[in-house]
A protein has these predicted regions:
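Short linear sequence motifs
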Residues: 7, 16, 54-55
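A residue-level marker of the well-folded mature domains of exported/periplasmic proteins
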Residues: 24-347
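Bacterial N-terminal signal peptides
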Residues: 10-25
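N-terminal secretory signal peptides that target proteins for export/translocation
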Residues: 1-8
Length: 347
């Protein structure tokens, strides 16, 4: 089960008494978490504690990732998963949580970073305390983690987003981008590659890039503002999982469903009504449960010394063998949700 922080404190207190018993001549394994020998394969049977930190709790994307993460922990059988994070998308509070977990002696901390620099600094401090660190969904500087669990390359995502909207609007017209925060590494990388891909569509003109943060109400208001400011707007990319439902609602309320296209990234369940009424034709994503699942498989393999820099593949439970490209553990294929297939997915 996913444990709250107070439970983990109790687990580590108990582990400390076991360690004392070992020094007194009793047999037993060394206490888990936060020690310099973490990652050796001779500890493959001990329970490891993994902290999974999203950009923001309460968003369907990250809730689905957490469900997949718990599935992986259950499959592995000796992983205690702690899922927690800020409720307002505040990087400083996320960094504080990383520090708390490091002090509690977690074995691995896995972070989706809303601010790569702030989170990277916190993860380096955790490393100094003997904690193994990885990132997932949104990366941090490479020197502050061992691996990045990557849903797809930023180029693949950026190119796909552009191609989908270009097809919907006839490859011409005014378009806008609604992202999350200006410090969000994954969205910034997608935008960079979107601009690159847009060179293939010279008749599409980006008139605005907005950053309302991880707040759906603010995304709704941003959508309304764009529709008023740019009456000739043909399409919008809403590239966070709160931006897409927010902007879609703005288009629906304005009566412009079918007139202004919107696509982006979101889990399918919150978007079904918008797809069914034609406000949204296509959604670009990946299986978020699988992303959470792969993150915990990666964390466990790292803690047990089963992967190391330079490896090319990872055995990842029900996902089979996953490719490692450099220090990126790759999830795989991008999914496109449409009216024809969205009811097949329930996350």
């Amino acid at each position: 089960m996913i444990l709250p922080n107070k439970t983990i404190l109790a687990v580590h207190w108990f582990a400390g008494w076991i360690l004392i018993g070992t020094f007194c001549g009793c047999s037993g394994d060394s206490a888990p978490g936060g020690n310099p020998t973490a990652g050796k394969s001779d500890s493959s049977q001990k329970t490891i504690t993994v902290g999974l930190l999203p950009k923001k709790k309460g968003i369907s994307f990250f809730t689905s990732c957490a469900e997949g993460a718990q599935e992986a922990a259950d499959d592995l059988g000796n992983v205690e998963l702690v899922y927690d994070g800020p409720t307002e998308g505040e990087p400083s509070k996320a960094a504080e949580l990383v520090s708390q977990w490091a002090l509690q002696g977690f074995d691995v901390i896995a972070v989706s970073a809303d601010d790569a620099q702030i989170m990277g600094a916190a993860m380096k401090k955790a490393q100094d305390k003997g904690v193994l660190t990885i990132s997932w969904d949104s990366d941090v500087p490479a020197d502050s983690r061992s691996f990045f669990v990557n849903q797809a390359t930023p180029q693949q995502i950026g190119f796909k987003l552009v191609d989908v909207l270009a097809e919907e609007i006839g490859k011409s017209g005014e378009v806008a981008i609604v992202s999350s925060s200006q410090t969000s590494n994954n969205q910034n990388m997608w935008i960079m590659h979107m601009k690159e891909r847009l060179k293939d569509y010279p008749d599409m003109k980006v008139v605005a890039i907005e950053y309302p943060g991880e707040d759906q109400d603010r995304c709704l208001e941003t959508g309304r503002t764009l529709l008023k400011a740019y009456p000739d707007l043909k399409g919008i990319w809403a590239i966070s999982t709160v931006a897409l439902p927010g902007v879609a609602e703005a288009i629906r309320q304005s009566g412009k469903s079918g007139e202004v296209s919107v696509t982006g990234v979101c889990t399918p369940t919150p978007m079904k009504s918008y797809v069914e009424d034609g406000t949204v034709k296509s959604i670009v994503l990946w299986d978020t449960r699988d992303l959470g699942y792969l993150t915990i498989q990666t964390a466990a393999a790292l803690a047990r010394g089963l992967i190391k820099p330079g490896d090319k593949t990872l055995k990842a439970g029900r996902l089979g063998e996953r490719e490692i490209v450099g220090d990126n553990v790759m999830l795989g294929d991008i999914l496109i949700f449409t009216k024809e297939n969205i009811d097949k997915y329930n996350f």
